[in-house]
A protein has these predicted regions:
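A glycine-rich, acidic short-motif signal
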Residues: 156-164
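DNA polymerase sliding clamps and clamp-related checkpoint/processivity subunits
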Residues: 1-150, 166-369
Length: 369
């Protein structure tokens, strides 16, 4: 059985696999690449405990009839290393004695292949998905994952939620104390659905498409999330449809007061608090504006800074909160004026840029002063 393929194309596909799986534990699955030969193309597949990757190469010549296919496993390291240094036309011959020979103009290289009977099955998208452009969607994902903190709640999540509604998509990320809702207009939804996307799968999209403007199809079968672009299919395994009910939290928020201020000025004030403690006390009133204070009683350290506010609606308010909690929340918002709503009933703050009110952060404060 023979197939002829351009080495530069194989190297491009295999280098993507190398980037995806360079840090995983090697075993009989992750150390092999599955190759399936069809009469008009080659399918290359790899997987680890969470991600599966499928890509096709159509610019090939094979001696397989249109009603046949043949699949085999080849050592990933061997295959990647060979094509990294051979970009010319390569003739691949698969022999019945479990040897595989790569022939090129200056010589040949031989190795071995094994049967794929024990290799896990690959799953493929079923039904329609949502379609987004990578240029805007990937930036939104980056903001969502950069927002969440490394607390004890995060390992249970490590995912963002794509909540697809009739006219928009909410991209939601959370940790123990915060919710970040990034809303995008979307007019092509066939039905409302919830899709989970892991941080692992998202990082693959960053690597592949961060500098491209490519359409991505995203769908789910309820257990896996599928990402499709160009000829690539990425399956994000073990993604169950369970996520904190963020809509309940958002809907119960009742505003008691509201203050408008400059985003960058508050960031500067919060950065000053690093000198003392990780908990800051925030007071808002018309006379003094916004006052941020941090105090370490044991070491007799205290810092306090004030900044003007642009407008205050409702009574003055105060709260305590983790510095990194509020700092990363403010940073996640678009530059310019920022509005902070305070809910006295639930001791929560909601922050957003008034020009983009549908993208906002909800923070649970620690306690009232």
């Amino acid at each position: 059985m023979k197939v002829r393929v351009l080495g530069i194309l194989m190297n491009e596909k295999l280098s993507n696999i190398s980037k995806m799986f360079d840090k995983v534990l090697k075993d009989c699955v992750t150390s092999n690449i599955k190759i399936t030969l069809y009469f008009d193309h080659i399918r290359i597949q790899a997987m680890n405990e969470r991600i599966t990757y499928t890509d096709d190469i159509f610019d090939v010549n094979t001696d397989i009839s249109c009603d046949q296919k043949f699949s085999l496993l080849v050592d990933a390291g061997t295959l990647i290393s060979f094509f990294k240094n051979h970009n010319q036309d390569i003739e691949i011959e698969i022999k019945n004695d479990y040897s595989i020979v790569f022939k090129y103009d200056r010589g040949s290289f031989s190795s071995t292949w094994i049967e794929d009977k024990a290799f896990p099955d690959f799953f493929y998208p079923v039904g329609d998905g949502i379609r987004v452009m990578s240029s805007s969607f990937i930036q939104s994902m980056k903001r969502s994952f950069a927002f969440v903190g490394s607390d004890e709640f995060r390992p249970a999540i490590c995912s963002i939620l794509l909540n697809v509604k009739k006219d928009y998509i909410d991209i939601v990320s959370t940790d123990m104390f915060r919710l970040f809702i990034n809303r995008k207009e979307y007019a092509n939804a066939v039905e409302e659905r919830s899709i989970m996307l892991s941080e692992v799968a998202a990082s693959i999209l960053y690597r592949f498409l961060s500098d491209k403007d490519t359409e991505i199809s995203i769908s789910t079968d309820g257990v896996r999330t599928f990402l499709c672009f160009d000829n690539v299919i990425i399956s994000d395994m073990n993604v169950e449809q369970q996520y904190p009910n963020y809509e309940y939290v958002c809907n119960k928020f009742e505003k008691s007061s509201s203050v408008k201020f400059d985003r960058d000025l508050l960031i500067s004030v919060l950065n000053s608090m690093t000198l003392v403690d990780n908990v800051v006390n925030v007071k808002v009133d018309k006379e003094n504006g916004i006052t941020v204070m941090s105090e370490d009683f044991g070491n007799r350290k205290k810092i306090m800074e004030s900044m003007p506010l642009n407008a205050l609606e409702g009574p003055c308010f105060n709260f305590s909160i983790g510095k990194e909690n509020i700092l990363s929340s403010v940073k996640s918002l678009i530059k310019g004026d920022t509005v902070m709503d305070w809910s006295d009933q639930y001791k929560m703050i909601k922050m957003f840029n008034p020009k983009y009110e549908s993208t906002y952060v909800l923070n649970q404060t620690l306690y009232n002063l």
